[in-house]
């Protein structure tokens, strides 16, 4: 985490805590000639545009005072989107009981992608229900976990 994203995290966390929102991620990157500061937030039941606007306005005020970025940039506050990977313990807790896609580094049960109901994630493994059977996948073999999108 860069100095800028650490400072932004310090500034945004009290705002999010006040409203019961979760910080998912902070990105600061250059795209073309412009710099973007992106703050991804969530809450149980999902984040709304009004929630994003509220956080954006309050964070913008704090950023103007502290001024951790010495050049112009665009501030974007948004939901993480349905296709983002589950990363934090809070992500896994929030999505317990939902169907996830697990992408693996090495084949497990002859597959590199396993879809199943999320039961639990701990320090050593991810536990799923697949075809009514409990399977335990070692954490070190997991490349990425995302919510399964059903059409």
Curated annotation (Swiss-Prot):
The keyword Transport does not apply. GO terms for biological process: ribosomal small subunit assembly; translation. It holds the Pfam family DUF150_C. The keyword Cytoplasm applies. Keywords: Cytoplasm, Ribosome biogenesis. GO terms for cellular component: cytosol. It comes from the Bacteria. InterPro entries: Ribosome_maturation_RimP, RimP_C, RimP_C_sf, RimP_N, RimP_N_sf. It is found in: Cytoplasm. PANTHER family: RIBOSOME MATURATION FACTOR RIMP. Required for maturation of 30S ribosomal subunits. Belongs to the RimP family. This is Ribosome maturation factor RimP. It comes from Caldicellulosiruptor bescii (strain ATCC BAA-1888 / DSM 6725 / KCTC 15123 / Z-1320) (Anaerocellum thermophilum). The gene is rimP.
């Amino acid at each position: 985490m860069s100095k800028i994203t650490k400072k932004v995290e310090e500034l945004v966390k009290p705002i999010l805590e006040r409203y019961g929102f979760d910080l998912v991620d902070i990105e600061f990157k250059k795209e073309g000639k412009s710099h973007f500061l992106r703050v991804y937030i969530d809450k149980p039941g999902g984040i709304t545009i009004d929630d994003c606007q509220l956080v954006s306005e309050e964070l913008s005020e704090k950023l103007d005072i502290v001024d951790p970025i010495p050049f112009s940039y665009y501030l974007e506050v948004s939901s993480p989107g349905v296709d983002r990977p589950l990363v934090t313990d809070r992500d896994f807790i929030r999505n317990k009981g939902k169907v996830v896609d697990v992408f693996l580094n090495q084949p497990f049960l002859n597959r590199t992608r396993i879809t199943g109901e999320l039961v639990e994630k701990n320090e050593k493994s991810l536990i799923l229900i697949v075809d009514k059977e409990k399977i335990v996948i070692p954490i070190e073999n997991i490349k990425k976990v995302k919510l399964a999108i059903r059409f």
